[in-house]
Amino acid sequence: MRFDPPLEEGRLLRRYKRFLADIESAGGERLTIHCPNTGSMLNCMSEGCRVWFSRSDDPRRKLPGTWELSETPQGRLACVNTARANRLVEEALLAGDIPELAGFASLRREVAYGVENSRADFRLEYPAGALFIEVKSVTLGFDETAVAAFPDAVTLRGAKHLRELAALARDGVRAVQLYCVNLSGIEAVRPADEIDPAYGKALREAAQAGVEVLAYGAEVTTEGLRLARRLPVRL
C-alpha cells in the first residue's frame, strides 16, 4: 500500500476533541487536520513530534488533511490512521501473504455475527466452512524492548469482540483475532494488562476457547505500508 499522493511532513501542535489535530507543515503552514484514531494514541502524540499527513482536494471535506503517521519518542514510525489496518490486512489476504488464512474462496467485509450485535471485519469462506476475523491496529510501544501492546485505552468493544469470537470457536467455527502492528521495529505483541486488564483476561480466555490469535508486523515508511511478517503474541 503506497501513499498516493505522497505524504507531507509537519510537527504536532496539539490533538483535541478526539478527531482534530493542529499541525505546522514543513513549510510553516498551520493546519487543522482530521485525526482518524479514537484511542488514546499513547506514545504517538507528544507535542512537537514529527507527523506525516495526507492532503485531499475534495471540496466536500471540512478539513484539508488526514493524520497518517507519527514518530514516537523511541524513533519508531507509527501509522495512526486505524482505517489503514483493515485495508492492509485485506491486501495481504488477497495476495496470499498470510499463509495461515490462505485458500479461501471468497471474502466479505463488515459481516454481522454473534449475539451482541457485532460486525466481523472479514468473513472468509472455505470448502470446510466460514472463518471470522477481527482486526486490531497496534501502535503502542512503551520503551526500547521492541514489544508492542494492545489496547492503548480501555476498550469494552474490543472485549466484546473477543467474547463473540470465543463463542464461535466453541461452536466449532474458525475465529481469528488478528493484530496488525503498524509500528516499526517491533518483534512481539502482548496484551496491555496495565491499561485494560479485562481485555487481557478476555484475550486469554478466547485463546483457550480456540480463537486463533495472530499478529503481523507492518513495514511502516513514509512512502507506504506493507504487512511483512508474523510476530509472536505473548499471552
Curated annotation (Swiss-Prot):
Coiled coil: none annotated. Disulfide bonds: none annotated. It comes from the Bacteria. This is Sugar fermentation stimulation protein homolog. The gene is sfsA. It comes from Pseudomonas paraeruginosa (strain DSM 24068 / PA7) (Pseudomonas aeruginosa (strain PA7)). GO terms for molecular function: DNA binding. Belongs to the SfsA family. HAMAP family: SfsA. InterPro entries: SfsA, SfsA_C, SfsA_N. Pfam families: SfsA, SfsA_N.
